[in-house]
Design a protein with these regions (language model features):
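Short, polar/acidic, helix-capping and beta-turn segments at strand->helix junctions
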Residues: 1-95
């Protein structure tokens, strides 16, 4: 689980970098709306939400209350490039 949480943190940092590239600054983020996480896992692994806590906890640490979000945690048998975690997110930004 700990390695998965580290992978989730790395994935969310990548998403934050994409936000900076798109809007110029994380200061424009007014709310993290949703995080959708996919965990590359075997058939006997059931702790997908615990893995995604790595990403969710980082968002709350970084953004405070506006970092709280809805979340989906799904286990899958494979991900592109055999990555451990893939994340998409919905973010509200201000002008």
């Amino acid at each position: 689980v700990e390695e998965g949480q580290a992978a989730a943190r790395a994935a969310i940092l990548n998403r934050l970098a994409v936000i900076v590239q798109a809007v110029g600054s994380l200061e424009k983020v007014s709310r993290i709306v949703a995080v959708n996480g996919f965990v590359n896992a075997g058939p006997d692994f059931y702790d997908h939400p615990k893995v995604l806590n790595g990403a969710s906890d980082l968002l709350v640490e970084a953004f405070g209350e506006i970092g709280r979000h809805s979340r989906t945690a799904v286990g899958v048998s494979a991900l592109p490039l055999n990555v451990a975690v893939e994340i998409s997110m919905v973010v509200e930004v201000r002008d």
